[in-house]
Regions:
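A metal-dependent hydrolase metal-coordination microenvironment
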Residues: 40-163, 253-256
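Cleavable N-terminal signal peptides
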Residues: 20-21, 31
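A general structural detector for well-ordered alpha-helical segments in enzyme core domains, enriched
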Residues: 57-61, 91-98, 118, 171, ...
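Divalent metal-coordination and catalytic microenvironments
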Residues: 47, 130, 186, 221, ...
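Charged catalytic cores and adjacent phosphate/nucleic-acid-binding surfaces used
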Residues: 34-40, 198-292
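N-terminal secretory signal peptides
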Residues: 1-9, 20
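Domain-core and long-helix interface of multi-subunit machines
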Residues: 134-144, 148-241
Length: 292
């Protein structure tokens, strides 16, 4: 078995090159965008990981960039390999206590399908929101496969890409319909061998199935600054359907709050405050209103 260092290429590692490549190009626009007055909604980055940073370092950065952060640490069983994985009520409550009183939203990024068994409803009710994505996918043997890792495509049977895409859309719907989530992140991401044919695989019919589920279960879709997803065609269809959005960087220090592409899409779509999700009060959050 390979060492953890060789095996554990996380989303953080996968994104590092993307973020680094985009920072120099977009930094001036991001700085301007965060303080812009042409938008009628507050600028919030609801996909921020502390990982090995600290809240004391992150809060001044949020103030400097004029962006409110939603902190999310990974949550689920210890089988998930990330710098921080919250796996029980005690760990979750300590995390919430650490963020208490700070000018940030308290969230988690839920992992796989078994994360709900790690926490009580009372513990989850202390969060402002719950986020997840679809990038961990069932392999041919039913085990979890992180689709961005080397060798993943063979494990999920990607020889028939259309068949995989149908399963992938089903997976989106299963997660949205069965998990008490408020936000779906990294929306419409595709494995490397498919990413160049985005419009071919994300047909209007497939997009509609995801949007219908998001509307039915009150799940907002992230406009991801790091992945520059969903593409504009998907976003326009989502806006026309009445789906709500949030903005997210998937950033680690010091790259959080860099929302240039997300804000560009918000302007292109003509989004206003009513189109944007913001964490609601107790009773309106997914962990309060959904059965699980």
């Amino acid at each position: 078995m390979a060492s953890p260092a060789k095996r554990a290429m996380t989303r953080r590692g996968f994104l590092r090159g993307t973020v680094a490549a985009g920072c120099l190009i977009l930094a001036p626009r991001r700085s301007h965008a965060a303080g812009s007055t042409d938008l009628d909604f507050p600028i919030e980055d609801l996909h921020v990981h502390l990982d090995n940073s600290t809240i004391d370092k992150v809060v001044p950065l949020a103030k400097e960039r004029g962006v409110k952060f939603g902190i999310v640490e990974h949550a689920g069983t210890k089988e998930n390999q990330y710098p921080i994985v919250l796996s029980n009520d005690a760990e979750l409550k300590a995390y919430v206590a650490m963020l208490e009183g700070q000018p940030v939203y308290k969230g988690i990024q839920a992992e796989w399908t078994d994360w709900m068994g790690c926490f009580s409803r009372d513990a989850l009710a202390q969060l402002d929101f719950i986020l997840t994505d679809t990038m961990t996918f069932p392999g041919k043997d039913g085990q979890r496969v992180k689709l961005w890792l080397e060798g993943a495509e063979a494990k999920v049977g990607l020889t028939d890409k259309e068949a995989f895409m149908d399963r992938y859309v089903d997976w989106h719907i299963e997660i949205i319909s069965r998990q008490p989530i408020d936000l779906l992140a990294n929306v419409s991401w595709l494995p490397g061998s498919m990413a160049g044919e985005y419009e071919k695989f994300w047909t209007e019919a497939r997009v509609k199935r995801v949007l219908d589920a998001a509307l039915k279960f009150g799940v907002a879709l992230e406009i991801s600054a790091s992945f520059k997803l969903p593409r504009l065609s998907f976003l326009r269809q989502a806006k026309a359907a009445g789906v709500r959005f949030c903005l997210g960087s998937n950033g680690r220090y010091p790259n959080m709050g860099q929302l240039g592409w997300s804000l560009e899409m918000a302007r292109t779509l003509g989004l206003n405050k009513s189109d944007l999700y913001t964490p609601g009060p107790p009773g309106l959050r997914a962990a309060d209103r959904r059965k699980f």
